[in-house]
């Protein structure tokens, strides 16, 4: 699995219908009906750790293939 930055993940989530609810510092909170609040850490262009990315994808109902297709 390739790692991506928090910024890139945010852009992908927004294309999938997630809406930015609020942000506090470097953490962006996204919401989508039927899913729990998703907190994405955004630290510039620094890549997310693989475990963090996998957990966020799982919570968002997405797969690694969804990222590759974008």
Give residue spans per PLM region:
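C-terminal structural segments of small proteins and small subunits
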Residues: 44-70
């Amino acid at each position: 699995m390739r790692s991506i930055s928090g910024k890139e993940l945010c852009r992908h989530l927004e294309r999938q219908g997630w809406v930015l609810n609020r942000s506090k510092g470097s953490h962006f909170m996204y919401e989508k009906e039927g899913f729990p609040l998703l907190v994405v850490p955004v630290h510039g262009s620094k890549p997310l750790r693989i475990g963090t990315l996998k957990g966020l994808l799982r919570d968002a109902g997405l797969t690694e293939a969804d990222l590759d297709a974008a």
